[in-house]
Amino acid sequence: MYKRQDLTEENLRLTKEERAVLDYVTREYRHVIVVFNVANMPEMGWLEEYDTIDAALMIGIPGTVGMQAVADVLAGKVNPSGRLTDTIAYQVEDHPSSANFGNYRYPGTLKTYIEYQESIYVGYRYFETFAPEKVQYPFGYGLSYTDFRWDVHSISTDGETVKAEVQVTNCGQRAGKDVVQVYFSAPYQKGGLEKSAICLAGYAKTELLAPGASQTVTVQFDFSDMASYGEKEQAWVLEAGDYTVSVRRNVRQSVAEEQLPLAERKVLRYDDKTGAPIQNLFSDVNGEITYFSRSNPEATYPQGPMTKLTDAVRNADTEPAPKTEGTVPTTGAVYE
């Protein structure tokens, strides 16, 4: 089954022809594996409609050489250990971005555009904050041909760095790899800085572990990575309060968590690598767009394109006239 476009919701749903193929295959075969050779996340709610579908494999677009690895996974020669980098919802329209699906042009111009009205609430940041019940397969989800036990040794901070240490043991019958994921939840006040309910902070993958083998992995990140951007302050802000750091198998499945308190509010006005001052960029192109907000989700939920061209956008891609004088070099000349 092949599609080359994703400009509308229908392009991410099964066609009648695809549904007919699935009906036939699942009726004639007792064990079916669905392989998704796709770049975007199609609608997958139909996987639960067929009792004979045993598994689904998300392979992206691996090309001809990559398909050899897919065959090895299907044959059991290689144990899959990938994790979803997207949230798979039951329906396409469950994604706020679907309100802006399409190929839009500003009136009277050839300029195309897409409006990201969902603000920071993209993917799991939206679903885990507002609509967890609409998720079929959560961010970070993935299965293996074996089982792993986790023993969380510590979740700690020295005020500058946050570190989690986890011992992973293969307690199954096949060799395999596992992925330890670490998330954080920052203190939030309604009407304050925009923050999602949970954010990925880091992850680590084990080596290939034989049955019974163990490995201790460490995931660490800067405490300042938990800051939120304040557009009015033009700075990154760490608000005072408890920061919850959790070790998880995916964004939904927590194994252990720790509260890390911050006594005083911190404002980060300079880049910690370059020392350059932090400031807003491109604020003049926002126009009249209403951005999705945690403080009032019903009133700010994306409704579709505004189709108004601001002067800032109109002139954004205009090439400035050269200000220097000189002679244009001769092209195609032959020199002896």
Segment roles from a protein language model:
Residues 1-2:
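Conserved small/polar residues in nucleotide/adenosyl-binding loops
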Residues 173-198:
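Short acidic, flexible loop segments centered on an aromatic residue
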Residues 27-32, 51-54:
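A short helix->loop->beta-strand "cap" motif at the edges of active sites that frequently abuts
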Residues 251-259:
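Beta-sandwich strand segments
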Residues 37, 42-177, 240-248, 261, ...:
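Secreted, periplasmic, or luminal enzymes acting at the cell surface/secretory milieu
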Residues 220-251:
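Short, surface-exposed ligand- or partner-binding patches at beta-edge/loop junctions that are enriched
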Residues 190-231:
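Intrinsically disordered, low-complexity Pro/Gly/Ser/Thr-rich segments with frequent PxxP/GP/PP motifs
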Residues 175-182, 229-232, 257:
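Short, hydrophobic/aromatic beta-strand segments
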